[in-house]
């Protein structure tokens, strides 16, 4: 295929090993790569934007090697892609990639994910976009994940990937010869307990750490093929999960299933 102009971002920050591996994987295939990502870790920032302070950027080419132009940005992952598309890039990219994330982005957790939010910014601007994660916080071998991501991205681009469709890729944390297959998946609904750990500082004041533990993964009842496996079950079986996600969150159920709202209060007589 002809070389693509690719924008890469993440939420783990400019010094993360995952984003460097992804950038190198894309560059090795002859693509033109530019990186705009947070200047420090900003995981779980969701789709937050910086409105109360200016955004600052610094060149970071030396972290990625020859031929890759890179910036570290003071903002969130969504800020990074928005700024790149509006100001930093000379031309609209052919593809936006976000990752490789150090840890999973599965099920309803994607609403908190800076990785997915960065990719979603590309989707909202009608650029084919994919979020990429390795489903372990301890896994360090990102080279194979980069190869998988580029294989999928190139195939999707060649097959008329709808720009309004975000692809969320999760790769199991195991060696290449132990990965079984790739499947389209549905989002799980993830439930947590003990979401906050209460502590006391030396002055006797309370503070809290967010420390939730997953206790239940439910299959979504939402729109889509009912025979698809959930993304969580796919990863648990050492299979690659690829989930199509749209920015349209509109509910598609029956009108009769909605709460009955008496609108007489709007213009009371």
Swiss-Prot record:
Query: What Pfam families does its record include?
Result: SurE (PF01975)
- The enzyme class is hydrolase
Catalytic activity annotation: a ribonucleoside 5'-phosphate + H2O = a ribonucleoside + phosphate
Residues bound to a divalent metal cation are: 11-12, 43, 101
GO cellular component entries: cytoplasm
Recorded hits in InterPro entries, A to Z, give: SurE, SurE-like_Pase/nucleotidase, SurE-like_sf
CC cofactor note: Binds 1 divalent metal cation per subunit.
* Compartment(s) of residence: Cytoplasm
Q: Which cofactor does it need?
A: a divalent metal cation
Q: Which domain of life is it from?
A: Bacteria
Name the SUPFAM superfamilies on file.
Answer: SurE-like (SSF64167)
Chief location bin:
cytoplasm
Q: Annotated Gene Ontology MF terms? A: 3'-nucleotidase activity; 5'-nucleotidase activity; exopolyphosphatase activity; metal ion binding; nucleotide binding
The EC designation for this entry is 3.1.3.5
Keyword list (alphabetical) reads: Cytoplasm, Hydrolase, Metal-binding, Nucleotide-binding
Instruction: State the NCBIfam families in the record.
Output: PRK00346.1-4, PRK00346.2-2, surE
**UniProt function note:** Nucleotidase that shows phosphatase activity on nucleoside 5'-monophosphates.
Family listed: Belongs to the SurE nucleotidase family.
> What is the designated name of this protein?
5'-nucleotidase SurE
């Amino acid at each position: 295929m002809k070389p693509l102009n690719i924008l890469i971002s993440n939420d783990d920050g400019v010094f993360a090993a995952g984003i460097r591996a992804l950038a190198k994987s894309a560059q090795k295939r002859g693509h033109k790569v530019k990186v705009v990502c947070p200047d420090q870790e900003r995981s779980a920032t969701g789709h937050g934007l910086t409105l109360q302070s200016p955004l600052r950027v610094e060149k970071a080419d030396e972290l990625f090697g020859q031929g890759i132009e890179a910036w570290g940005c003071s903002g969130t992952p969504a800020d990074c892609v928005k700024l790149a598309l509006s100001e930093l890039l000379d031309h609209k990219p052919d593809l936006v990639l976000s990752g490789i994330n150090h840890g999973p982005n599965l099920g309803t957790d994607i609403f908190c994910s800076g990785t997915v939010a960065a990719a979603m910014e590309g989707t909202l601007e009608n650029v084919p976009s994919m979020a990429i994660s390795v489903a372990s916080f301890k896994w360090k071998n990102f080279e194979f994940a980069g190869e998988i991501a580029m294989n999928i991205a190139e195939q999707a681009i060649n097959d008329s990937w709808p720009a309004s469709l975000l692809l969320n890729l999760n790769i199991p944390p195991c060696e290449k010869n132990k990965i079984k297959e790739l499947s389209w998946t549905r989002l799980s609904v993830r439930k947590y307990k003990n979401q906050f750990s209460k502590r006391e500082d030396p002055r006797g004041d309370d503070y809290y750490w967010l420390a939730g533990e997953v206790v239940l993964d439910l299959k979504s009842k939402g729109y889509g093929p009912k025979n698809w496996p959930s993304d969580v079950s796919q990863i648990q079986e050492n299979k690659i999960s690829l989930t199509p996600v749209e920015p349209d969150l509109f509910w598609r159920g029956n009108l009769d299933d909605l709460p009955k709202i008496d609108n007489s209060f709007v213009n009371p007589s």
